[in-house]
Design a protein with these regions (language model features):
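Residues at structural and domain junctions
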Residues: 27, 34, 64, 102-106, ...
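A generic local structural motif
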Residues: 25-28, 51-53, 71-73, 133-135
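Short, structured beta-strand-loop surface elements
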Residues: 17, 71-152
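Short, conserved active-site entrance elements at the starts or edges of catalytic domains
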Residues: 7-50, 60
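Ser/Thr/Pro/Gly-rich low-complexity, intrinsically disordered segments
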Residues: 1-6
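Short beta-strand segments
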Residues: 36-70, 84-88, 97-101
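Solvent-exposed, well-ordered amphipathic alpha-helical segments
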Residues: 32-34, 54, 59, 111, ...
Length: 153
């Protein structure tokens, strides 16, 4: 079977450079979290119960950015408390590393949203563009909420 890189005409070295550009490493409190495609974002209910959700994320300026539906449970819980935890995970939410304490907040400034969106586009490429297209067609793009996560050292 021919690997997909051969279909695209990418040599092994070019493919590796392309992968390195997509995965922006941030040397600070994030550690190796940014090497993963998904992270588990745990937020807390008023009762103190933890609710963990796998999400796409991207690092920019030493912080992590996530987008979600504006009426999601994550958004409701973050309006109550900024306390959160993060851990690298797979798409199904199975944790792949250690949990880290974090502080999360909803982002409303358009400049910060643009920066977060650019970081996600750089990391996930065509997948974000395709998601944006479907969100725009269904009207969900305007109802999108952005979350900034600051991981504790």
């Amino acid at each position: 079977m021919v690997p997909p890189s051969a279909w695209l005409g990418l040599s092994g070295r070019r493919q590796a450079r392309r992968r390195e550009r997509r995965i922006v490493s941030t040397v600070n409190a994030l550690g190796d979290l940014d090497r993963y495609r998904y992270m588990c974002l745990a937020t807390f209910r008023r009762s103190g119960a933890e609710v963990a959700t796998p999400v796409w994320f991207a690092a920019s300026g030493g912080k992590l950015y996530v987008f979600t539906a504006g009426d999601s449970g994550k958004v409701k819980r973050l309006r109550h408390t900024a306390r959160a935890r993060v851990a690298p995970s797979d798409a199904r939410g199975r944790v792949q590393g250690a949990w880290r304490g974090a502080t999360a907040r909803l982002v409303t400034e358009s400049q910060m949203i643009e920066r977060a969106h650019a970081a996600l586009r750089a990391k996930y490429g065509w997948q974000v563009l395709l998601g944006d297209l479907f969100s725009r067609l269904t009207g969900r793009l305007r109802r999108r909420a952005w979350i900034e996560v600051e991981v504790e050292p």
